[in-house]
């Protein structure tokens, strides 16, 4: 069965993924007819899973019934004790804890807006976000309570502290256990699809973080979209006589196949879009078990994969690499894994091969999404991954993808340009940033800032971030290509490529390379190696070799700005003859 035939089958009238037309920001938009109208409806539907295990956290096991009883009780506290009303904003600042999930569900079920605070932020950053989002209440863990105490006290914002034990509380704070008492019913509130549901702050690798605002409808459409693309692959497998899931098809509520029920492990922060929407909400919606990690640790992840029979591993490429590099990897049973993947541009080919070889059944997959798309975008797995391994996949029925030139005009098939996306899953805009919203979303189209191309079959190929391209003497050097070549060297553990100012060329190519423990590799040796794989103008003229871990933010993205700034500072200390 062809891809288009499978799409037609799963979206036919009367099918679960039947299509309709809705109005989004005044524009007719193709959407799923049967998506939940709001997150409140989604959470209500999860009650049917009752005593099935939902969250597993450090020895705790929460059923769906446990979770919803806690959600109901907290929602009542928000309305009755704190006067939270539809449209009010409530901040969540904590690590990956069950209370994070409960807080999110309670806030959005009463029509309030969940504002996710990066758990890595220091007090100044927390202060900025509180001033930007102006929440009526903050729900925090003890560590975040310390950072939020002063900004909240100055503004008169109360706090609820989860898992605070008997530690003294900041002014205006109360313990979760003092307030939340199961048995209280969920307050009656009308929540609509057009209502704001979330503010997720972008990772802020450059400049000030922006709060991306999503509606209930956008999130629910994205969630059904994840399931739809799994259903499309399954339809193709069944039509060709293959068992469901044989080719590694994905989707939060796709068929279990031979592996039994699907089980997700949460290895990315809930305050970022991947952890919150496809992993947490996808598990919630589909009645799946969610194994939560407080913080990333490869050995602990292997323990949980074995003990809980985890099937879905969704993170950033470095986390799959960390698993495979763990000295105790071979002592754990990872045979339950069916999908090992993540988001963004395709992983280095060497990592893809390692995943294929290292996991008995865990086929690699990749998805392309971002905060502004609620993590939903083209996805590549199963047979498509085998035939198009360098592609990030193709869109699904509610998603439009175009490649455009700098003036916003579509380019021919195969030509390179900026990736633009449209659909009901996009954010409404940026909180308090009308100018940036207008620049980013134009006539219902999001221009992503990423460079790529589409082939004749609709497969998307990510070339690089537009701002992650080095313009060297008129030649475009794409950092992802150079990084992929560096990763092929057996002594390299990780690498980051970026541009530095150059008096003659405009920019020169630079890289920081972490050498694997016990290996020896110097800059000259790496350049000699790269000479066999890259054109000379692509080989970094500035190489910094290190054995230290390269800096990343909480979502696992490389902090290239820090590396670039460090190189620039070193450059200032050199004499012209030393450069």
Say what each PLM segment does:
Residues 1-15, 109-178, 517-519:
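Structural core segment of the AMP-binding/adenylate-forming
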Residues 20, 59, 146-193, 208, ...:
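ANL superfamily adenylate-forming
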Residues 34-35, 51-85, 89-97, 101-105, ...:
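Conserved AMP-binding/adenylate-forming core of the ANL superfamily
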Residues 121-128, 138-142, 313, 423, ...:
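AMP-binding/adenylate-forming catalytic core of the ANL superfamily
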Residues 222-263, 271-311, 326:
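Conserved AMP-binding/adenylation subdomain of ANL enzymes
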Residues 535-555, 576-579:
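AMP-binding/adenylate-forming catalytic domain of the ANL superfamily
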């Amino acid at each position: 069965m062809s891809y288009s035939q499978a799409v037609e089958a799963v979206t036919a009238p009367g099918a679960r993924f039947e299509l309709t037309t809705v109005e989004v920001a005044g524009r007719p938009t193709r959407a799923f007819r049967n998506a939940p109208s709001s997150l409140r409806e989604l959470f209500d539907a999860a009650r049917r899973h009752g005593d099935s295990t939902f969250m597993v956290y450090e020895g705790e096991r929460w059923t769906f019934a446990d979770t919803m009883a806690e959600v109901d009780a907290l929602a009542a506290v928000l309305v009755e004790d704190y006067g939270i009303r539809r449209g009010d904003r409530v901040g969540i600042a904590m690590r990956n804890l069950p209370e994070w999930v409960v807080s999110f569900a309670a806030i959005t079920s009463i029509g309030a807006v969940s504002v996710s605070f990066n758990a890595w932020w220091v007090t100044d950053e927390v202060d900025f976000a509180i001033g930007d989002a102006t929440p009526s209440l903050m729900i925090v863990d003890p560590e975040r309570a310390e950072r939020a105490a002063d900004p909240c006290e100055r503004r008169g914002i109360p706090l609820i502290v989860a898992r605070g034990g008997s530690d003294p509380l900041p002014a205006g704070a109360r313990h979760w256990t003092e307030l939340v008492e199961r048995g209280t019913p969920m307050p009656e509130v009308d929540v609509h699809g057009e209502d704001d549901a979330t503010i997720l702050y972008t990772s802020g690798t450059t400049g000030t973080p922006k709060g991306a605002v999503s509606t209930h409808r956008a999130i629910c459409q994205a969630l059904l979209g994840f399931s739809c693309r799994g259903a499309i692959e399954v339809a193709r497998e069944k039509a060709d006589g293959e068992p469901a899931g044989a080719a590694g098809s994905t989707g939060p509520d796709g068929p279990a196949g031979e592996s039994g029920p699907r089980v997700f492990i949460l290895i990315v922060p809930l305050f970022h879009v991947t952890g919150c929407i496809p992993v947490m909400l996808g598990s919630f919606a589909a009645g799946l078990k969610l194994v939560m990690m407080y913080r990333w640790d490869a050995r602990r992840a292997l323990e949980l994969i074995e003990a809980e029979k985890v099937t879905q591993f969704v993170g950033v490429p470095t986390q799959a690499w960390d698993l495979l590099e763990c000295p105790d990897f071979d002592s754990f049973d990872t045979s339950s894994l069916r999908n090992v993947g993540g988001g963004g541009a395709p992983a280095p080919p060497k990592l893809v091969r390692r995943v294929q070889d290292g996991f008995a059944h865990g086929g690699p997959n990749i998805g392309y999404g971002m905060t502004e798309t609620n993590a939903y975008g083209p996805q590549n797995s199963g047979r498509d991954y085998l035939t198009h391994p360098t592609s990030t996949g193709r869109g699904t029925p509610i998603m439009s993808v175009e490649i455009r030139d700098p003036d916003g005009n579509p380019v021919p098939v195969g030509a390179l340009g900026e990736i633009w996306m449209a659909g009901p899953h996009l954010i409404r805009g940026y909180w308090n940033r009308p100018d940036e919203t207008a620049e980013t979303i134009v006539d219902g189209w999001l221009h992503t800032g990423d460079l790529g191309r589409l082939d004749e079959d609709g497969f998307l190929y990510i070339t690089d971030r537009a701002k992650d391209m080095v313009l060297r003497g008129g030649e475009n050097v794409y950092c992802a290509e150079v990084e992929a070549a560096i990763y092929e060297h057996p002594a390299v553990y990780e690498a980051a490529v970026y541009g530095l100012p150059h008096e003659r060329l405009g920019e020169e190519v630079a890289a920081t390379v972490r050498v694997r423990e016990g290996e020896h590799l110097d800059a000259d040796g790496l350049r000699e190696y790269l000479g066999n794989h890259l054109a000379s103008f692509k080989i970094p003229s500035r190489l910094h070799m290190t054995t230290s871990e390269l800096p990343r933010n909480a979502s696992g993205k490389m902090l290239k700005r820090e590396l670039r700034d460090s190189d620039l500072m070193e450059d200032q200390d050199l004499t012209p003859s030393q450069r």
